[in-house]
Amino acid sequence: GELEIAQTIQQAMLPKVFPPFADRLDLNIYGMVRPAKEIGGDLYDFYVRHDKLFFCVGDVSGKGVPASLVMATVRSLFRSITSHEEQAHVIMRQMNDALSDSNEQNMFVTLFLGVLDIESGELHYCNAGHNAPVLNGEMLPVLPNLPIGVASGFEFQPQTTTIHHNDLLFLYTDGLTEAENTRHEQFGEQRMLQILDQQRGERPRHITDMMEAEVASFVGAAQQSDDLTMLVIRYQTDAILMRNDIQQIPTLAEWVEGLSIPMELNMPINLALEEAVSNVMLYAYPGRNDGKVYVEYVETETPEGKTLVFTISDSGVAFDPTQTPDADITLSAEERAIGGLGIHLVRQLMDEIRYERSDDKNILTLVKRV
C-alpha cells in the first residue's frame, strides 16, 4: 500500500553503491537511511563533478507518500542545479525558489548542502535550518537560514571552511539525536559526539553501523518514530591500491615508509601488513590476478595516546583469516608456505585484529595503539 510506495520512492533515490568511487583514494563515503514505520522524507545524495564533491542531507517536514514525493523533487533539483552551478548558497537559493513556487503540499525541507574542492580541501557550504554536521568531533558552525520551500527569493548566506587530510565529516538528521526510549528521553547530541569520538579512526561504514547499533540499544522497545539518516565523508586518507600480485609487495613497503609512523613501529607494522596483504593476494582471487587489494591508514589522537588503524579490503571470495589456525612454527622457513606465519604473526604484532564481510567485500582491520 501507501507505505510500500513511499519506501520505494525514497530508496530509489538514494545512492546505493559503496564505496561509491572505487578508483578514488581521496574520498571514502558511506550513507544510509533507516526508514521509520511511517516514512519520513529523509534524503542524502552526493556525486563528483570536475574534482568537486557535491553532497547534501535533508529532512522533509511531513510523512508518507507526500513527503517522499517532495524528497524526490529535492533530490532531482539538487542534481539538475549542481550540474551547472558550483556555489553552495546559489544552489540552495535556486532549489528554494523552485520548491517554493511549486509547493502545493506546503512542506518545507531542512537541508545541509556542501561543495568540497577535492584538491584543496576547501569546503563551501550552506545550511537551510538543518542540524549542524560534525567535523572531527566538533559541531560545524552554521548560520540560521530558513529551510527551503518556505519563502521564494530568500537570500541564503554562504559559509566556508577548509578540511584536511584524514578529516571526518558526519552528517545526520534529527531522527538520530531525537530518537526516544520508552521513558521519552532523547538520544541527544552528547551521546552522538561521544560515539563519534570513540570511532574516529574507523571506516565510514563502521561508524554508521556502530551509531545505528547504539541508537537501537538506547531506544529499546520504543518504536522508531522518525527516519534515521547518516552520511559520513572521510577526506584524503592515506591509501594504496594494488593488484593481487605478490610482486606488488615492495610497493606496500614503500608506501608504509612514506606514512608518518613512529620510527620504532615501522618494522613491525610493515611485517604485519605484508603478511596480511600477501594472505589476501594468495587466497581472495583464486586463479585470477586482476583482483584489487585496497589498504587504508588512519591515525587518531586521544588523551590516552595515538591509535593507528589499517584497513585491508578486497572484493574476492569470502575469507576470514582470523579463523585460520596458527602456523606450525616448528617448521623451517623454507617448509612454511609464504604468508603461512600469517595471522599468528599479525596477532603478535598488532593490538587488535578483526574481520568482517560487508558490501561483498572482505574487510580486515588491524589496530596498533602507541
State the predicted function of each range.
Residues 62, 177, 278, 282:
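Short active-site segment of divalent metal-dependent hydrolases/proteases
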Residues 214-243, 347-370:
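Flexible, glycine-/charge-rich segments associated with ATP-binding catalytic modules
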Residues 1-170, 220-248:
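… and, occasionally, acidic/histidine-rich disordered N-termini of signaling adaptors
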Residues 253-278, 334-337:
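Conserved short strand/loop->alpha-helix "switch" segment adjacent to the catalytic nucleotide/phosphoryl-transfer site
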Residues 164-171, 176-239:
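C-terminal catalytic subdomain
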Residues 281-370:
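Conserved beta-strand-loop-beta-strand hairpin that lines the nucleotide-binding pocket
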Residues 174, 274-275, 279, 348:
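Conserved polar catalytic motif of the HATPase_c/GHKL fold
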Residues 135-137, 180-186, 319-323:
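Cytochrome P450 core scaffold surrounding the K-helix E-X-X-R motif
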